[in-house]
Amino acid sequence: MVVLGSTGSIGTNSLEIARKFNIEVEALACAENVKKLNAQIAEFHPKFVYIKDEKLKSKVAHNKIFSGENGICEMLNRCESKTVINALVGFAGLIPSLKIQNSGKILCLSNKESLVVGGKFLDTSKIRAIDSEHFGLKFLLENSAKPAKMIITASGGAFYKTPIKDLSSKKAADALKHPNWNMGAKITIDSATMANKLFEMLEAFWLYGCKNLDALIEPSSSVHALIEFIDGSTAAHLSRTDMKLAIAHAILPNLKSEILKPVDLLSLNLKFEKIDIKKYPIFELKDEVLSNPDLGVIINAANEIAVFAFLQGKCGFLDISSTIFKAVEKFNDLTPENAEDLIKIDKIVRNFARSELRL
């Protein structure tokens, strides 16, 4: 298999699954973590590697190295593996996702932005989603009656217990303290703003064709997804907070081995809550984005600029949501007709967001 984003959380867990099941790793790709990439090269002996920054090529312990803007697609052209894990972060994952599908390979997708931005240009019936919520929905849908409603859950993020009046003063270090999951910086901030849950609802729309979608806060992150059926019954999917389960099922669809220990039902203290729009204003866009999924590229571009500005201390926490709302208001009439349009719209919105944040 090929692992794009191999040094991140999903990539690292994917390689743990490869190690456990003796899966050959043909290629690895990362942005800049040379030390971790070299350790992975030493263990898995890939044929090809990619590093985003060309200046770092000399530090990579390999003789077949790709880099630069088109390097991942060039590397994929050389790869014979049928399975590719796309665990890249942000909009940068879109073109590789399109390339993977166009080449007939199996796309195991952790890069949610590919669906958020370009879901209508991907064959979602052939995507194996690496996400605890969407794996949960898939698990519940198998051998089940037609669903009436799908529900995914949110932990509430780092500021779940923080009073609304205190949010404006919160810094990146505060937002990065997720109560349940060990994730990368961007997705942890997205969890705190609830942008991550908005994205996951759009993912669920593209993956399963259901518009009757909702999300609830379940603070323990033990319940990942629920489905309400027409007959009035409800099914829930529970597992420990470990992405290796979703990854293993994406890589090995006929999996019959233990990946995680079962949830200790006797220790659970489950409760569900509505998502408070005053605390998580981004979630107010839920119905609008489900009725007009083309907004995904606008929301994602504004969010990426604002999140990375926040991480660098260049804007406040609440500026993330306000920047997104301004971008949606200004560009909601833009409709991408192809992948090239997505790239153009993404660039326009990013420039607008930078201007609004005075970056």
UniProtKB/Swiss-Prot annotation:
Its EC number(s): 1.1.1.267
GO-annotated molecular function: 1-deoxy-D-xylulose-5-phosphate reductoisomerase activity; manganese ion binding; NADPH binding
Gene Ontology terms describing biological process: isopentenyl diphosphate biosynthetic process, methylerythritol 4-phosphate pathway involved in terpenoid biosynthetic process
Cofactor names: Mg(2+); Mn(2+)
Reactions it catalyzes: 2-C-methyl-D-erythritol 4-phosphate + NADP(+) = 1-deoxy-D-xylulose 5-phosphate + NADPH + H(+)
SUPFAM superfamilies: 1-deoxy-D-xylulose-5-phosphate reductoisomerase, C-terminal domain, Glyceraldehyde-3-phosphate dehydrogenase-like, C-terminal domain, NAD(P)-binding Rossmann-fold domains
Positions annotated to bind NADPH: T7, G8, S9, I10, A31, N33, N111, E113, G184
Name listed for the protein in its UniProt record: 1-deoxy-D-xylulose 5-phosphate reductoisomerase
Origin organism lineage: Bacteria, Pseudomonadati, Campylobacterota, Epsilonproteobacteria, Campylobacterales
